[in-house]
Amino acid sequence: MYYFASDVHLGAGDEPTSRRTERCFVRWLDMVSADAEAIFLVGDIFDFWFEYGKVVPKGFVRTLGKLAELTDRGIKVVFITGNHDMWSRDYLQKECGVKVVHTSRTITLGKRTIHIAHGDNLNIGDKPLLRLMNSAFRSNILRKLFSNLIHPDLALCFGQWWSGKSRKSHANETITPQSLQFLIDYARGYKQQHPDVDCLLFGHMHYPHFHSEENLDIAFLGNWSESEGSYAVSDGEGNIELKNFR
Protein backbone atom coordinates (compact mmCIF):
# COMPACT_ATOMS: atom_id res chain seq x y z
CA MET A 1 0.00 0.00 0.00
CA TYR A 2 1.02 3.61 -0.58
CA TYR A 3 0.22 6.30 1.99
CA PHE A 4 0.11 10.10 1.72
CA ALA A 5 -0.09 12.74 4.47
CA SER A 6 0.60 16.46 4.74
CA ASP A 7 0.23 19.51 6.97
CA VAL A 8 1.00 17.98 10.34
CA HIS A 9 2.70 21.27 11.36
CA LEU A 10 4.80 19.73 14.11
CA GLY A 11 5.88 22.48 16.51
CA ALA A 12 2.72 24.56 16.06
CA GLY A 13 0.98 25.79 19.19
CA ASP A 14 2.30 25.43 22.72
CA GLU A 15 4.57 22.55 23.69
CA PRO A 16 1.87 20.22 25.12
CA THR A 17 -0.29 20.71 22.01
CA SER A 18 2.63 20.08 19.68
CA ARG A 19 3.61 16.97 21.62
CA ARG A 20 0.09 15.52 21.40
CA THR A 21 -0.02 16.18 17.65
CA GLU A 22 3.33 14.47 17.24
CA ARG A 23 2.21 11.42 19.20
CA CYS A 24 -0.91 11.18 17.05
CA PHE A 25 1.19 11.34 13.87
CA VAL A 26 3.69 8.76 15.14
CA ARG A 27 0.81 6.38 15.97
CA TRP A 28 -0.33 6.76 12.36
CA LEU A 29 3.17 6.01 11.07
CA ASP A 30 3.17 2.91 13.26
CA MET A 31 -0.19 1.80 11.89
CA VAL A 32 0.57 2.26 8.20
CA SER A 33 4.00 0.67 8.48
CA ALA A 34 2.28 -2.72 8.77
CA ASP A 35 1.68 -2.86 5.01
CA ALA A 36 3.31 0.27 3.54
CA GLU A 37 5.52 -0.03 0.49
CA ALA A 38 6.03 3.73 0.52
CA ILE A 39 4.94 6.76 2.54
CA PHE A 40 4.76 10.18 0.91
CA LEU A 41 4.90 13.22 3.21
CA VAL A 42 3.47 16.03 1.09
CA GLY A 43 4.81 19.16 2.79
CA ASP A 44 4.40 21.17 5.98
CA ILE A 45 5.13 18.19 8.19
CA PHE A 46 6.98 20.72 10.34
CA ASP A 47 5.57 24.14 11.17
CA PHE A 48 9.10 25.47 10.64
CA TRP A 49 12.27 23.66 9.68
CA PHE A 50 15.70 25.08 8.95
CA GLU A 51 19.07 23.35 8.82
CA TYR A 52 22.50 24.76 9.46
CA GLY A 53 25.59 22.72 8.67
CA LYS A 54 25.64 21.21 12.17
CA VAL A 55 22.36 22.41 13.71
CA VAL A 56 18.73 21.35 13.26
CA PRO A 57 15.64 22.45 15.23
CA LYS A 58 15.15 21.11 18.73
CA GLY A 59 12.36 18.59 19.19
CA PHE A 60 10.49 16.14 16.94
CA VAL A 61 12.65 13.25 18.17
CA ARG A 62 9.72 10.81 18.17
CA THR A 63 8.96 11.59 14.54
CA LEU A 64 12.58 11.54 13.42
CA GLY A 65 13.24 8.30 15.27
CA LYS A 66 10.15 6.66 13.79
CA LEU A 67 11.07 7.75 10.25
CA ALA A 68 14.56 6.32 10.71
CA GLU A 69 13.06 3.08 12.02
CA LEU A 70 10.74 2.77 9.01
CA THR A 71 13.47 3.37 6.44
CA ASP A 72 15.75 0.92 8.29
CA ARG A 73 12.98 -1.64 7.80
CA GLY A 74 13.03 -1.00 4.07
CA ILE A 75 9.94 1.22 3.81
CA LYS A 76 10.47 4.04 1.33
CA VAL A 77 9.69 7.50 2.75
CA VAL A 78 9.56 10.49 0.39
CA PHE A 79 9.28 14.03 1.76
CA ILE A 80 8.00 16.65 -0.71
CA THR A 81 8.66 19.96 1.02
CA GLY A 82 5.98 22.60 1.59
CA ASN A 83 6.07 26.31 2.29
CA HIS A 84 6.79 25.78 6.01
CA ASP A 85 9.65 23.31 5.58
CA MET A 86 11.11 24.28 2.20
CA TRP A 87 14.53 24.89 3.76
CA SER A 88 15.19 21.22 4.42
CA ARG A 89 18.63 20.18 3.22
CA ASP A 90 20.27 16.78 3.74
CA TYR A 91 19.70 16.01 7.44
CA LEU A 92 16.53 13.95 6.95
CA GLN A 93 18.16 11.97 4.18
CA LYS A 94 21.47 11.32 5.92
CA GLU A 95 20.14 10.68 9.42
CA CYS A 96 16.66 9.26 8.78
CA GLY A 97 16.92 7.75 5.30
CA VAL A 98 14.13 9.99 3.97
CA LYS A 99 14.28 11.08 0.33
CA VAL A 100 13.78 14.87 0.29
CA VAL A 101 12.24 16.38 -2.85
CA HIS A 102 11.84 20.14 -3.36
CA THR A 103 9.57 19.94 -6.39
CA SER A 104 6.44 18.05 -7.32
CA ARG A 105 6.75 14.36 -8.09
CA THR A 106 4.99 11.99 -10.48
CA ILE A 107 4.63 8.28 -9.73
CA THR A 108 3.02 5.36 -11.53
CA LEU A 109 0.98 2.81 -9.59
CA GLY A 110 -0.37 0.01 -11.74
CA LYS A 111 -1.85 1.63 -14.83
CA ARG A 112 -2.44 5.02 -13.17
CA THR A 113 -0.12 8.01 -13.07
CA ILE A 114 -0.33 10.27 -10.00
CA HIS A 115 1.18 13.75 -9.76
CA ILE A 116 1.94 14.88 -6.19
CA ALA A 117 2.55 18.50 -5.10
CA HIS A 118 2.20 20.44 -1.87
CA GLY A 119 0.24 23.14 -3.69
CA ASP A 120 1.54 26.38 -2.18
CA ASN A 121 3.11 27.90 -5.29
CA LEU A 122 0.70 26.76 -7.99
CA ASN A 123 -1.61 28.89 -10.13
CA ILE A 124 -0.42 32.17 -8.57
CA GLY A 125 0.33 34.04 -11.80
CA ASP A 126 -2.25 36.73 -10.97
CA LYS A 127 -0.84 37.31 -7.46
CA PRO A 128 2.41 39.30 -7.86
CA LEU A 129 3.07 39.73 -4.13
CA LEU A 130 2.68 36.00 -3.51
CA ARG A 131 4.95 35.23 -6.46
CA LEU A 132 7.59 37.64 -5.10
CA MET A 133 7.46 36.14 -1.61
CA ASN A 134 7.60 32.63 -3.02
CA SER A 135 10.70 33.45 -5.08
CA ALA A 136 12.37 35.20 -2.15
CA PHE A 137 11.83 32.41 0.36
CA ARG A 138 13.05 29.78 -2.10
CA SER A 139 16.16 31.81 -2.93
CA ASN A 140 19.51 30.18 -2.17
CA ILE A 141 20.90 33.65 -1.46
CA LEU A 142 18.37 34.27 1.31
CA ARG A 143 19.01 30.82 2.74
CA LYS A 144 22.76 31.45 2.88
CA LEU A 145 22.31 34.90 4.43
CA PHE A 146 19.94 33.45 7.02
CA SER A 147 22.32 30.64 7.94
CA ASN A 148 25.56 32.66 7.94
CA LEU A 149 24.51 35.93 9.57
CA ILE A 150 21.99 34.92 12.23
CA HIS A 151 22.63 32.80 15.32
CA PRO A 152 20.60 29.55 15.22
CA ASP A 153 18.61 30.41 18.37
CA LEU A 154 17.52 33.75 16.90
CA ALA A 155 16.91 32.32 13.44
CA LEU A 156 14.72 29.49 14.71
CA CYS A 157 12.78 31.77 17.04
CA PHE A 158 12.12 34.14 14.15
CA GLY A 159 11.16 31.29 11.84
CA GLN A 160 8.74 29.83 14.37
CA TRP A 161 7.19 33.25 14.95
CA TRP A 162 6.82 33.87 11.21
CA SER A 163 5.31 30.43 10.59
CA GLY A 164 2.86 30.91 13.45
CA LYS A 165 1.92 34.36 12.17
CA SER A 166 1.31 33.00 8.69
CA ARG A 167 -0.79 30.11 9.98
CA LYS A 168 -2.86 32.29 12.34
CA SER A 169 -3.59 34.80 9.57
CA HIS A 170 -5.65 32.08 7.88
CA ALA A 171 -7.08 30.56 11.06
CA ASN A 172 -10.45 32.29 10.77
CA GLU A 173 -10.91 31.56 7.09
CA THR A 174 -13.70 29.13 6.29
CA ILE A 175 -12.42 26.58 3.81
CA THR A 176 -15.06 25.13 1.50
CA PRO A 177 -14.89 23.09 -1.71
CA GLN A 178 -15.06 26.41 -3.56
CA SER A 179 -11.80 27.45 -1.86
CA LEU A 180 -10.08 24.63 -3.72
CA GLN A 181 -11.11 25.86 -7.15
CA PHE A 182 -7.78 27.47 -8.06
CA LEU A 183 -6.01 24.13 -7.60
CA ILE A 184 -8.76 22.27 -9.44
CA ASP A 185 -8.23 24.71 -12.33
CA TYR A 186 -4.49 24.11 -12.10
CA ALA A 187 -5.06 20.35 -12.18
CA ARG A 188 -7.20 20.63 -15.32
CA GLY A 189 -4.49 22.66 -17.05
CA TYR A 190 -1.83 20.19 -15.94
CA LYS A 191 -3.92 17.33 -17.33
CA GLN A 192 -4.13 19.07 -20.70
CA GLN A 193 -0.34 19.38 -20.81
CA HIS A 194 0.24 15.88 -19.40
CA PRO A 195 -2.59 13.69 -20.70
CA ASP A 196 -1.04 10.56 -19.20
CA VAL A 197 -1.72 11.85 -15.65
CA ASP A 198 -4.81 10.31 -14.05
CA CYS A 199 -4.77 11.92 -10.61
CA LEU A 200 -3.30 14.99 -8.90
CA LEU A 201 -2.80 14.97 -5.15
CA PHE A 202 -2.32 18.15 -3.08
CA GLY A 203 -1.73 19.23 0.50
CA HIS A 204 -1.63 22.85 1.72
CA MET A 205 -5.37 23.58 1.87
CA HIS A 206 -6.09 21.90 5.25
CA TYR A 207 -9.33 20.53 3.82
CA PRO A 208 -9.76 16.86 2.90
CA HIS A 209 -11.71 16.56 -0.32
CA PHE A 210 -11.92 14.26 -3.33
CA HIS A 211 -12.94 15.71 -6.69
CA SER A 212 -13.56 13.48 -9.67
CA GLU A 213 -14.42 14.31 -13.27
CA GLU A 214 -13.93 12.64 -16.62
CA ASN A 215 -10.46 11.06 -16.80
CA LEU A 216 -9.20 13.06 -13.80
CA ASP A 217 -9.23 12.64 -10.02
CA ILE A 218 -8.03 15.37 -7.63
CA ALA A 219 -7.35 14.59 -3.97
CA PHE A 220 -6.74 17.11 -1.16
CA LEU A 221 -5.14 15.60 1.93
CA GLY A 222 -6.36 17.81 4.77
CA ASN A 223 -4.36 18.42 7.96
CA TRP A 224 -3.62 17.08 11.46
CA SER A 225 -4.48 18.05 15.04
CA GLU A 226 -3.83 16.72 18.53
CA SER A 227 -6.23 13.80 18.13
CA GLU A 228 -6.81 13.13 14.45
CA GLY A 229 -5.57 13.58 10.92
CA SER A 230 -6.61 12.90 7.35
CA TYR A 231 -4.57 10.97 4.83
CA ALA A 232 -4.84 9.13 1.52
CA VAL A 233 -4.10 5.52 0.73
CA SER A 234 -3.60 3.86 -2.62
CA ASP A 235 -3.34 0.24 -3.60
CA GLY A 236 -0.87 -0.97 -6.19
CA GLU A 237 -3.34 -0.11 -8.97
CA GLY A 238 -3.38 3.60 -8.15
CA ASN A 239 -6.88 3.84 -6.71
CA ILE A 240 -6.97 6.70 -4.17
CA GLU A 241 -9.10 6.77 -1.01
CA LEU A 242 -9.19 9.51 1.64
CA LYS A 243 -9.35 8.35 5.24
CA ASN A 244 -9.38 9.80 8.75
CA PHE A 245 -7.12 8.66 11.59
CA ARG A 246 -8.04 9.02 15.26
Please tell me what each predicted stretch does.
Residues 2-4, 39-41, 115, 201:
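Residue-level marker for buried hydrophobic side chains located in beta-strands
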Residues 47-70, 157, 165-200:
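N-terminal short leaders/motifs
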Residues 35, 73, 110-112, 196, ...:
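Residue-level preference for short coil/turn positions at secondary-structure junctions
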Residues 97-102, 120, 124-132, 137, ...:
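Conserved beta-sheet core of the metallophosphoesterase superfamily
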Residues 1-3, 107-115, 212-218:
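Beta-strand-turn-beta hairpins that frame and shape the catalytic cleft
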Residues 119-183:
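Active-site-proximal loop/helix segment associated with metal-binding centers of metalloenzymes
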Residues 5, 10-109:
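Core catalytic region of metal-dependent phosphoesterases/phosphodiesterases
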Residues 12, 114-122:
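Catalytic core of the metallo-beta-lactamase
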